[in-house]
């Protein structure tokens, strides 16, 4: 539990620093990317805005995960010093408002998966899918409070209705299916779901065989560990 908390807040701290740097050097970044990048045609607005959208989505993903494990957590959105000031836990309403603001921005700035953007980047399809999932979770927390009077789930005063949240989630999913946020469809051959660059994946963590980049779980990513080896211990045939 402590490991998850520490790693996600370290991730958030990195995101906060990146966002501050992007905003401080926007003109220089825009000019350098527009002059050299093959992805120029895929960018919605300026290059920096797209990068900011990607980082804000990833930061929101971290906060969404934290909320699922811990409930209300401190919302830290700016770089802090080595001894940051105390930040109280945010309420559910504050957390979800933050998540929606972050994802709506990302949805307006990130590129579609079929726009020529490099594979592995955050796309509008990934954002829309995560936004739908967030709304479903939000509705479920509200329902829990309504059904059980659960203090952990807090009260529902001033929150969106479960009906509107579920309706929003359905609309987002329908739009994903119909191609509003890129090109996605189910694979006809089930094992193909687990191969790279297939048409069903909306968001994935890229990895390089041999070094495990992007995932702490060695299975399938760390060279010889692809067959189950861990710390030099290999499986043998029966």
Where are the predicted features?
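Conserved, well-structured interaction surfaces
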Residues: 1-70, 83-97, 101-119
């Amino acid at each position: 539990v402590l490991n998850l908390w520490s790693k996600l807040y370290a991730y958030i701290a990195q995101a906060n620093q990146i966002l501050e740097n992007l905003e401080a050097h926007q003109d220089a970044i825009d000019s350098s990317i527009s002059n050299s990048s093959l992805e120029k045609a895929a960018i919605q607005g300026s290059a920096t805005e797209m990068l900011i959208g990607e980082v804000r989505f990833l930061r929101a993903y971290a906060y969404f995960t934290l909320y699922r494990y811990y409930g209300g957590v401190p919302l830290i959105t700016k770089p802090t010093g080595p001894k940051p000031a105390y930040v109280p836990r945010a309420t559910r309403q504050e957390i979800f408002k933050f998540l929606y603001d972050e994802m709506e921005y990302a949805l307006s700035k990130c590129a579609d998966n079929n726009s020529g953007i490099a594979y592995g980047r955050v796309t509008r399809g990934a954002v829309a899918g995560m936004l739908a999932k967030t709304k479903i979770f939000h509705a479920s927390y509200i329902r829990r409070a309504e059904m059980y009077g659960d203090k952990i789930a807090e009260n529902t005063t001033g929150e969106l209705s479960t009906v509107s949240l579920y309706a929003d989630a359905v609309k987002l999913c329908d739009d994903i299916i119909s191609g509003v946020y890129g090109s996605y469809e189910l694979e006809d051959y089930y094992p193909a779901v687990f191969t790279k660059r297939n048409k069903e994946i909306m968001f994935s963590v890229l990895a390089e065989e041999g070094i495990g980049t992007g995932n702490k779980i060695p299975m399938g990513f760390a060279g010889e560990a692809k067959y189950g080896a861990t710390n030099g211990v290999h499986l043998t045939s029966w």
